[in-house]
Amino acid sequence: MQRRDFLKYSVALGVASALPLWSRAVFAAERPTLPIPDLLTTDARNRIQLTIGAGQSTFGEKTATTWGYNGNLLGPAVKLQRGKAVTVDIYNQLTEETTLHWHGLEVPGEVDGGPQGIIPPGGKRSVTLNVDQPAATCWFHPHQHGKTGRQVAMGLAGLVVIEDDEILKLMLPKQWGIDDVPVIVQDKKFSADGQIDYQLDVMTAAVGWFGDTLLTNGAIYPQHAAPRGWLRLRLLNGCNARSLNFATSDNRPLYVIASDGGLLPEPVKVNELPVLMGERFEVLVEVNDNKPFDLVTLPVSQMGMAIAPFDKPHPVMRIQPIAISASGALPDTLSSLPALPSLEGLTVRKLQLSMDPMLDMMGMQMLMEKYGDQAMVGMDHSQMMGHMGHGNMNHMNHGGKFDFHHANKINGQAFDMNKPMFAAAKGQYERWVISGVGDMMLHPFHIHGTQFRILSENGKPPAAHRAGWKDTVKVEGNVSEVLVKFNHDAPKERAYMAHCHLLEHEDTGMMLGFTV
């Protein structure tokens, strides 16, 4: 944090003493302070160090083993500048293999950090990132095949903040941790003794791993002292399987200024902001009075995700206004998007996402046996019963020898790291048609090595705030089309990935490799 920002925030926290007595009591005692990840910049040699290790974190009254980058849980926000090369030295102090994927970065397959980029226990990997893409909020996380869900659940995730000349000219809020605030939202399930309770089994392979505790930057319902004016929130849905739907507790609007790959042409005003797993959106919200309010996530129509306490609006964080003013603004225009090129004559690739019917049926049965009808709130019951072969449900063996590890597929094939499915042409636009027809599950589909444009999303034109640069598209029982282009090489040994970002689907086969 720069000295002037530190001094200003120190003053801001001091001003909390000027709040009304009741407000001070709420601020001081009721909620933990929102943890702010360190903003990690390069050293004099243009290098950054990330150390992956295990530690201890406290959630409520219990302490759990967690994993983190440069700490016990989560990680720093790595700051990158467009046009400036950075070398990242990654040290793995875990007792198992891992990888580090740069989600949203347009970098060659050699440094993308997919499942082939293994860092052994006690090992080191160095990658040089030549950043040449617009300012954006991206992130990094493990991509160890078959274990991505568990390693993310244990705590491994960090932000990437890309800056360029264009964004620095805008008067957006930019005081890190004060009026420019990272918000990493994840749900967790804990065992009776307080440890993270991760399971990859038939049920989670079908619907994903989810929990009943929501963490924001690793804390339960924290609060943030915000100066008056515009507050910028960099939202990341870091959940394994839970989609979120952000809103405010007092219905003040959110102004979306950026999606996965950077700024929108102009702010988009919304009252609700659905965010899929792995997606990022930057929003501005006006803090223009003395009234505290909550950022909340509203109930979603996703299998298993309306189980209490998520059957009603659930607090993500409290925003507590303080008596000083910030200087950031909400510009009328933000950036320019290139016009979509002609789609005539482009290579068309068709990807059919599918789940083994046995997995569907067994997973849903186990979900309903564990959680009851609440697990299906908001779902189409007639469609579900058809999917589950309801008449046969009582004759299932609850797992037996069923191989759920390869039960999710793309174009009829479970992921094979040694067999890329196709070769994309470098520097050429392609039209990818991604279908979830015949499958009722939510599949946020993520493509490595590119930022694309959504042509249609689940059979409809994309919403205004989803029409900019994206690396993830919603596929849910329908067809989505995206316009992609790859500007870097990805040879067979370091192929790019395209996969469902519901991590348990990815870990059980719904992923493909492709070369450029």
From Swiss-Prot:
What is the name of this protein? Multicopper oxidase CueO
Q: Where is the signal peptide?
A: 1-28
> GO molecular function: any one?
copper ion binding
On assembly, the entry states: Monomer.
Q: Which NCBIfam families match?
A: PRK10965.1 (NF008205)
SUPFAM superfamilies in the record = Cupredoxins
- Which Pfam families does the UniProt record give? Cu-oxidase, Cu-oxidase_2, Cu-oxidase_3
Q: Which UniProt keywords apply?
A: Copper, Metal-binding, Oxidoreductase, Periplasm, Repeat, Signal
Q: List the disulfide bonds.
A: none
- Detail which positions bind Cu cation 2: H103, H141, H501
EC number(s) stated in the UniProt entry for this protein? 1.16.3.4
Q: Name one GO cellular component term.
A: periplasmic space
Organism field: Escherichia coli O157:H7
- Keyword Magnesium (UniProt): no
- Reaction(s) catalysed by this chain's protein: 4 Cu(+) + O2 + 4 H(+) = 4 Cu(2+) + 2 H2O
